[in-house]
Amino acid sequence: MLLALVPTASNAEVVIKLATVAPKDSIWHTHLKKIDQRLQMASHGEVRLRIYAGTLGDEDDILRRVRVGQLDAAAISTAGLSSIDKATQAMHIPLAFVSNEEMEYVRDGVAKQLEPLLAAKGFRVLTWAEVGWVHFFSKEPVATPDDLRKQKLFVWSNGDSANSEKLWQDFGFNTISLSSIDIMPALQTGMITAFQAPPLMALANQWFPFAPYMTDLKWAPLVGATIITEKAWQKIPVRLRQELAQIVAEEAPNLQKDVRDLEQQAMDAMVKRGLKIVTVDQAAKDAWLDAVKTGYPQIRGKIVPEKYFAETLRLRDEYRALNLQATR
């Protein structure tokens, strides 16, 4: 990563260039600004962030800039992280989780195993973060897998997207692979008629007016991480590294709480502006579960390395067993 070193009267100022696809003034951008404010205060202006929010393309574009040294850090989702290591997709297994608490337990356990993989490739994880629960948004109501098969579904073109897109297609879905920055024009022109995203993203990017039906099904949690290259980390004065790590660690729970609190508010705001929630009854839910379980053998190994797929489900089952015992 490239660090801008600007001489001052006493010390050199370290500017960490960090990018995210999150739009300016979104909840994620707001929290990054809080981290920057606290970091500048704690370091007396010696270290600061220069944040690029929603201006440098999609997550693959951001990572390319990181790799060539134009950027030092990134706040990206597992969709982008998967281009560094496929194992990060373990936290995005469809219909594997039913609650925030369950997902958090699994995330914390899996993260400990993912961080060394990213470190081996030159990236230090400052924190993991929630983006929200992914739902389907569509131009026509979608309650069942067959309903979704009638739509032109956006799938991510970054990370390990080829295998993911093929899996969707193998199960009869009509997919269009695009960069996230192309979702809006694709919706406007009818190139796509459905997309997957957390409600906060659908609202922040103003995608939902063009796909005004949201399926009431928590498809998967979308998790992200703030990463910095080891090269950039080493250029931060040693006495300030722990300060940065502590500030990020202290802000992480605040972001998590805000994301969870605002998710329902985002849905309410969209409903007031025309969004319709499509109910998924038990028969439809069973159809989704059957479709997903049929796909698990192909997800395991091709999209998520077998070891991490198994570990994710093991931790989930462990949480459920512990929670069941606690309620007896």
Model-inferred region functions:
Residues 6-9:
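N-terminal signal peptide c-region/cleavage motif recognized by signal peptidases
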